[in-house]
């Protein structure tokens, strides 16, 4: 064979081999490696389905479609498919959701701080859940500033914390936390805690000693080692097989990584589509078997896939008509399905993978239209609460924005005229669910969320002079220069109708809205 013919033969055979490789390589599912389960593909097509909850706030055991949750938050999935959910609000229970969707109660049932079995135990706003290899559950008991343990038989004990807010390392039952929302357990049985309102990550070792892994004396946004690092209201936490701790750093809109030596770095995020808005208030985390992440958002309700290199893709909650409210808890089962709680819609969902080219079908999402409104008894948010007040804005009006666009959005609530400095009062009893319930400090749209009600255009928790209305419920944070920067109200804080929430700012009216974004209703 001539040299030219031989070269052409090599070229042709190489081309055929490359073409064959391209044609037979599937995009999804990924082939199973010989050493274990398949690698988690990026950007898989998702199908959302309802597991349990009828979308009405309440407490009701029974078949999934008729069961009711109040404020479903943390979730774990066992090998047999059973799910456990931490249900806060007025429920304060740990619920069991069987494979067939039937819901029952494992432990709790009243707001308090008591160890015991089943209904004898008491929780105060249970948030995240984690599990150990023996099948025990660990609860971030936010309102009790404690970490609790629940056995498969429903026996509840306190692992760490005194029941009082504070910050102290040391023996577990003498250590103090401040509203912990996140909890995770590694393969050695060590417990990691997102100590939310201390802005720290804590570690409960197997010898019962509590130490601080990372974070300092004040909130902030700095990478570094140990106490040099700063967090801003960390809520979600997970630990992978290599000992790396992942943190949903809520107020910093960031995912943070803590290495085995305690060095904190921020994961650089980049979307698969340049038009997608970046993560907004990451709330919850779950890890895949190969160390990638799923992240739930507080404000948009989206569930996102986040790879270790920072690439991310919206899986659920981003499509028209399929909007979610608050992806508060996430868990991944052995088959790779993602289970999550939608706290604002009082439901539990599952996300499954579809083959490439298969379109997802619409699922039941959002709160039910039958979800009852808060009991306001006709109260107004200003004095006199049973008197006459002028309504200056109603639900559904066409409104402009601050940049001059006259038809920017539909008004999402009710506006009541009030004098600048007038005290804003709660119109119903309520309990704070959001870990970041106050927003836009000193801005025109400053507001506070109490249960399903939002109170806007006020100085949250402050008089016109800036003094706190109630230091036990409102905490004033300062920036590095010592200037006031934010009001913090813990998840689990209660307000009664008539309690002072703030004072009207220079907008000269109070705004009331009810319901998660996309599901607004008339607040009066």
What is each stretch, according to the model?
Residues 1-14:
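N-terminal Sec-pathway targeting helices
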Residues 36-73, 102-127, 155-179, 209-233, ...:
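Gly/Pro-rich loop segments of beta-rich domains
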Residues 77-80, 131-134, 185-188, 239-242, ...:
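Residue-level detector of Asp-centered blade-edge/turn motifs that repeat once per structural unit
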Residues 82-85, 136-138, 190-192, 244-246, ...:
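Conserved beta-propeller blade signature
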Residues 88-89, 142-143, 196-197, 250, ...:
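Short loop/turn segments immediately following the C-termini of beta-strands
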Residues 92-96, 102, 145-149, 155, ...:
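A short loop-to-beta-strand structural motif that recurs across blades of beta-propeller domains
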Residues 326-363:
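Blade-level signature of beta-propeller repeat domains, shared across WD40, Kelch, NHL, RCC1
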Residues 358-454, 459-466, 488-510, 520-524:
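Surface-exposed, glycine-biased beta-strand/turn segments
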